[in-house]
C-alpha cells in the first residue's frame, strides 16, 4: 500500500537526521519510486527554474548543506545528474532521502542515473558493503539497485540544456536516438547507454579511447555538432572531479558540475550547483564541506576516486 504524505514526511524528517529507514520501508519506497520512474522518459523534460547538481557519492551532510545553500525541496526544483552512492560514508541515507523526495514531490525533483547506479560498481565501491553493515543483509542493496534500472538516462531543460551524468556516444547523434534506447537494465559494459554514463569531454578533437575503460572521450567538434543538430545551447554533465565545483570546457558547449565538496573526504575541492532561472539565466553557487561529523566505524580505506 502506498505511503501517505504523512508517512513520507515522517520518513523524510527521519532521513534528514541521517537515520536510515527500516528495511520494509525501503522496499515500499522503492516500489513507489519505480511506478513513478516507469512513466519518465530516457530524455526527461524539465521546466525552469531548476537547480542542477552533480555527484553526491554518499556525502550525506554535504547534501544537507547543498539544500541549505540552494533551497529546500520542494521550494526549489532540483535535477540531480547521478552518482548518489559509493565512496562516502552515508550512501544509504543519501539515496534514501533523494528517492523519498522524488516520491513525495515527483514534479519538483528529477533524479538521473550515474555510472555508480549499477549492481557491479556498487559491489566494488562501497554501497553494497554499507547496506550489509547497516541492515545485516543485502536486501536493501537489491531494492535500490533494482530501482536504479528505471532512472532516466538524461534530461532536457526547456529544450535547450541537455543534462546527463557522463557524456556523448558515437552511436547517438540525436535526442531521438536516446529516446529509442531500452534503458531498463543493468548498465552495460559498452554501447550507447554505457557511453552516456561514462564518457568525458577532452581537449582533443573527435572520439578517443577513455582511460576509464568504459565510454569514450569526445572533442569540442563532437559537442558542437551534437548541440547544433539537436538545437541545444549547452550540455551539462557531472562525473569528473573539478576543483572549483564547476568547469566550462569546449568553448562553453559543455559544463561539468560536481557537488561533492572535499571529495572522498580528502580531495580539497569546492562543490557547486547550477541555478537555471526563469529566463534560462545561469548562476553557479559554490560551497565548502559541511562540518565533519563523527565518522562511522569503518575499516575499509576510501577507494581511489578516478572511476
Curated annotation (Swiss-Prot):
Q: Where does Mn(2+) 2 bind?
A: 83, 115, 165, 239
Keyword Zinc on this protein? Answer: no
Q: Which UniProt keywords apply?
A: Cytoplasm, Hydrolase, Manganese, Metal-binding, Protein phosphatase
Q: Which residues bind Mn(2+) 1?
A: 55, 57, 83
Instruction: Show the CDD domains listed in the entry.
Output: MPP_PP2A_PP4_PP6
> Which SMART domains does this entry report, sorted A to Z?
PP2Ac
Q: Name one Pfam family in it.
A: Metallophos
Give its E.C. classification number: 3.1.3.16
Q: Catalyses which reaction?
A: O-phospho-L-seryl-[protein] + H2O = L-seryl-[protein] + phosphate; O-phospho-L-threonyl-[protein] + H2O = L-threonyl-[protein] + phosphate
Q: Which family does it belong to?
A: Belongs to the PPP phosphatase family. PP-2A subfamily.
Instruction: Please name the catalytic residues of this protein.
Output: 116
Provide the protein name. Answer: Serine/threonine-protein phosphatase PP2A-3 catalytic subunit
Annotated InterPro entries: Calcineurin-like_PHP_ApaH (IPR004843), Metallo-depent_PP-like (IPR029052), PPA2-like (IPR047129), Ser/Thr-sp_prot-phosphatase (IPR006186)
Q: What GO molecular-function term can you cite, just one? A: protein serine/threonine phosphatase activity
Q: Which SUPFAM superfamilies match?
A: Metallo-dependent phosphatases
**Cofactor, free-text remark:** Binds 2 manganese ions per subunit.
Q: Where in the cell is it found?
A: Cytoplasm
* Cofactor(s) named in the record: Mn(2+)
Amino acid at each position: 500500500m502506498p505511503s501517505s504524505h504523512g508517512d513520507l514526511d515522517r520518513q523524510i524528517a527521519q532521513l534528514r537526521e541521517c537515520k536510515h529507514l527500516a528495511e520494509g520501508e525501503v522496499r515500499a519506497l522503492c516500489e513507489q519510486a519505480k511506478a513513478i520512474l516507469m512513466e519518465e522518459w530516457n530524455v526527461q523534460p524539465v521546466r525552469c527554474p531548476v537547480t542542477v547538481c552533480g555527484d553526491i557519492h554518499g556525502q550525506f551532510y554535504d547534501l544537507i548543506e547543498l539544500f541549505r545553500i540552494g533551497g529546500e525541496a520542494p521550494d526549489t526544483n532540483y535535477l540531480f545528474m547521478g552518482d548518489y552512492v559509493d565512496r562516502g560514508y552515508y550512501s544509504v541515507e543519501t539515496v534514501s532521502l533523494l528517492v523519498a523526495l522524488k516520491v513525495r514531490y515527483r514534479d519538483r525533483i528529477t533524479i538521473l542515473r550515474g555510472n555508480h547506479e549499477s549492481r557491479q560498481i556498487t559491489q566494488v565501491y562501497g554501497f553494497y558493503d554499507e547496506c550489509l553493515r547497516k541492515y545485516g543483509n543485502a536486501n536493501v542493496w537489491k531494492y535500490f539497485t533494482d530501482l536504479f534500472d528505471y532512472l532516466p538516462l538524461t534530461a532536457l531543460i526547456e529544450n535547450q540544456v541537455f543534462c546527463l551524468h557522463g557524456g556523448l556516444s558515437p552511436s547517438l547523434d540525436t535526442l531521438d536516438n536516446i529516446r529509442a534506447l531500452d534503458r531498463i537494465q543493468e548498465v552495460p559494459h559498452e554501447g550507447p547507454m554505457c557511453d552516456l554514463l561514462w564518457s568525458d569531454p577532452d581537449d582533443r578533437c573527435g572520439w578517443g579511447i577513455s582511460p576509464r575503460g568504459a565510454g569514450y572521450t569526445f572533442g569540442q567538434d563532437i559537442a558542437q555538432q551534437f548541440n547544433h543538430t539537436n538545437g541545444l545551447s549547452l550540455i551539462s554533465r557531472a562525473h569528473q572531479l573539478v576543483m572549483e565545483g564547476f568547469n566550462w570546457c569546449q568553448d562553453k558547449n559543455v559544463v561539468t558540475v560536481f557537488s561533492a565538496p572535499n571529495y572522498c573526504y580528502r580531495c580539497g575541492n569546492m562543490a557547486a550547483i547550477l541555478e537555471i532561472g526563469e529566463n534560462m539565466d545561469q548562476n553557479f553557487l559554490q560551497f565548502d564541506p559541511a562540518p565533519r561529523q563523527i565518522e562511522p566505524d569503518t575499516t575499509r580505506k576510501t577507494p581511489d576516486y578516478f572511476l
